[in-house]
Amino acid sequence: MILTAVLTAAVLAGGGYFPTDIGNRLTQTVSAAKKDSDKKDDTSESEGSVLDQATLMYQQYNYDEAIKLLKQQDDFDTNKDYMDLAAKCQVAKSTLVEYPLEQITHVFFHTLIDDTGRAFDGDSKSGNYNQVMTTVSEFNKIIQIMYDKGYVLVSPHDMATVNDDGTMSRGKIMVPEGKIPFVLSQDDVSYYHYMDGDGCASKLVLDENGEVKNEYVEADGSVSVGDYDLVPLLDTFIKEHPDFSYHGRKGILAMTGYNGVLGYRTDIAYKTGENLQDDQKKFLEDNPDFDYDQDVADATKVADAMKAEGWEFASHTWGHMNATERSAEDLKTDDQKWKSYVAPILGDTDMIIFAFGADIGDWSGYSSDNPKF
């Protein structure tokens, strides 16, 4: 296009003889050549994109989808790269074995601690942090060890499927011999007020590349963006080790709502100013320009980006309730709050991870006469 413009400008400028028909033909020739070049570039980029997608599917044991994607391409029968990768998928698929669902374990974490000096500073929260939290360094070591031992991330939705009539059927997880499927989750990804200043991330955000990262407030009050908690840490690990994820699975985030979600103050109390706890009052006093609707919009964008990358959300009850001890009516009221103020941001969910591990039933399972069920 630049060359075409220069030639056209030369004709219009005059100063010498330049036959119009020759100028037109030259302009058309250069334009056509440019279009052909653009077309080749587009084709090359498209081919690379397809190969990248199919290769990732191959690395994450999703062989059927990789083959399907490759064979959908018009030039599949003449593209050696496509055919070779499809053949590799067929061979790998033939070696898969079904993993016993009853042997799948669940590993969960709370918010990770980055600055141990601030978390374990001897105040009243230090003991609890030490008992139930994990540091960033510990998490990285745990995940590396699990990867080295052959663990692979799966979802509960791989273990069971919901039929059209509402009944459930067993899923089937097919992995290479020696791989060990497991489910990973993180509780309370709300970045509660009580954790402020204790060396943990403050929220999840989208960086300049649209990737999900953490906002982190340093000890001196400056703000950094990076991998300071489980979500971006695991995202980065899986980019480097794609075979740690089965079919692109990540983890499940068990969400409350009373302090908002993902570090955004999205509960309705922050908008109405009603029934505020002391830490919520302090937040609003410290942030007089707080925009509730903007926080809801920002949280929704982050949640959408996370779901697109394989993350899933579960209810942890809106108020972190002990489902064993609380009445069915309390749980119903709590669930309505979750549906009203959390689901519009995160989306609906068919999973609950009980706060405190407090179930609504016992070892014998649920029954229809259980009002909580």
Residue ranges and their predicted role:
Residues 102, 107-117, 167-168, 175-182, ...:
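Metal-dependent polysaccharide deacetylase catalytic core of the NodB/CE4 family, i.e.
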Residues 361-373:
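Substrate-binding cleft/loops of secretory-pathway carbohydrate-active enzymes
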Residues 1-23:
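Sec-dependent N-terminal signal peptides of Gram-positive bacterial secreted proteins and lipoproteins
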Residues 52, 56, 64, 68-71, ...:
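Solvent-exposed, polar/charged alpha-helical surfaces in well-ordered, non-transmembrane soluble domains
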Residues 21-95, 102:
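N-terminal, intrinsically disordered, polar/charged segments of Gram-positive cell-envelope systems
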Residues 32, 84-182, 191-211:
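N-terminal pre-catalytic segment of deacetylase/amide-hydrolase enzymes
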